[in-house]
Amino acid sequence: NEAVTKTRAEIESIVKSIDSRMTIHDFRMTPSGEKRTNLIFDAVVPAGLAFTKAELEGLICEKAVRLNPTYNCVITFDDDFTVEE
């Protein structure tokens, strides 16, 4: 679906603007009535990031709503335990 692909790319851009090491996966869009669209996804948070998960959620959701006021983010945060070399 073109709309899902476009919106996923926009959300990926938002996440990368916060920290280039962050990634998202399992992205879905589900309409919730006429005035709301849930953006449901997982975000991988790198170790040592200066933001709490609540702060990250606020930043991501605020920027998503600027793209489209009907967007409502539902984010599951995963910790990234991989070791950078």
Task: Tell what function each PLM region has.
Residues 1-85:
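Alpha-helical transmembrane segments and adjacent TM-loop junctions that form the membrane-embedded core
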